[in-house]
Amino acid sequence: MKFATIILLAGLMAARGAEVTARPTAEFLDSIGVDTTFPDRGQPLEKTIEMIRYGGFRWVRGGIEGLTEHGPTTLRTYLELHERTGVKFSWGLVSGGTDLEKLLGTARELAEAGALLAFEGNNEPNNWGVKYKGEDGGGRAKSWLAVAKLQRDLYAAVKGDAVLRKYPVWSISENGAEVDNVGLQFLTIPTGAGTLMPEGTRFADCANVHNYIYHPASPHPMDNKTWNAAEPGPACKVDGLYGNYGRTWGRHFAGYSESELASLPKVTTETGCTIDGEVTEEMQGLNLLSMYLDQFKRGWNHTSVYLLRDRTDEGGNQSFGFFDRDYTPRKAALYLHNLTTILGKGEGGREGAAEELNYTIDGETGTVHDLLLENSAGVFQLIVWDERLTGKDEVTVKLNGKKDSVVVYDPTAGVKAVWAGEWASEIGLTLSNHPVVVEIGALR
């Protein structure tokens, strides 16, 4: 990436831009999560800790599957991971689980340690059915009523617990596959929905989606690939929010309207892509970097990528990981490490009210996106990224008045600044397929 001339002339008229309210840098960093293997599947805790620290992940998708009193994966495994990295956990029933007593009991210990983030319903009941109170649901069963009743009871149990009620409950994943209209396409079933479960049934506080970047309906790299995967409406070409909460992809049951989906609380507990065919290691690295940014920009509260490290206990194409099976970091790990390191500078200081910055981006095309953050040291961090498959865009960031310090970073190049200047009012950037971070007001 090259940088065009930085305009420093004192006599330039200030650009008339738009006042944009910055979001806390910590809020974006806290959204960055990952799915991982634990000792019960052959991944030592020490190695997991090293990889979590390197990537800068803030939360991990966890749950009671594979969790036993005597190990190799115990609750102490999770607590130690939290103590040594600071990560929090979404805590779920995972695949086919129904033990609410175990879920809540272990969650109380996580909450006491400050390690609990949220609760999660069943993982993909279309693939892993449940048997709840003698009733089969999901999988090959003819109904999803058992899945719905379990999720209803999970929600009620959490909200009825004096310790746990403050934690959000995330819905099941792949509710778009329901074979009968039990109502899981809603967080709370509205009046007149015509579902099998009654109106007013509460399932969750937050929608949960597995919007993998590549899908049979969108199998190839393209411009705005991850921006589209994060799309909340029907324009999404992958297994996104609309197909699970707008109109279900399986039997086309009606859910929320497009306007309601735009503001629906939502998380992703699985996304990602394998290295295969057109998707090279470089492409995977760029996709995962922009996916975290796109998700946050488009209103997703938390995003977990599958997978931290390639599986060693499964067959097939095991190349989802940020790390290879021998723990070698791929470019995805390197690029994320660089981004979280760049943004993490100055964190841990004061927490103040959100501030505004007046700026415009001239030359911004449909593949160029931006996100304004402010760290706890009061430094603005403007992330500008492009999602072109080929070619470049020349853009100019115009600030309303000259700023005493501007520093530019490229996370695909490293953690050191690629340009720094004083009293700048315009910053020219040549963008292509990855983000740059423009620090404004940084103390150097």
Protein language model regions, located:
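Hydrophobic h-region of N-terminal signal peptides that target proteins for export
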Residues: I6-G17
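Boundary/entry segment of secreted carbohydrate-active catalytic domains
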Residues: A18-G66
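Hydrophobic faces of well-ordered beta-strands that scaffold small-molecule active sites
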Residues: D30-T36, V60-G62, V87-L93, L117-G121, ...
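Aromatic-lined substrate-binding rim segments of carbohydrate-active enzymes
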Residues: E46-I52, W59-L116, G138-I172
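Noncatalytic carbohydrate-binding groove/subsite architecture in carbohydrate-active enzymes
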Residues: V94, L100-R108, S143-M291, R298
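Aromatic/acidic polysaccharide-binding cleft in carbohydrate-active enzymes
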Residues: G272-E364
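Carbohydrate-binding surface patches
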Residues: N358-D404, P411
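C-terminal beta-strand-rich structural cap/linker in extracellular carbohydrate-active enzymes
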Residues: W419-R444
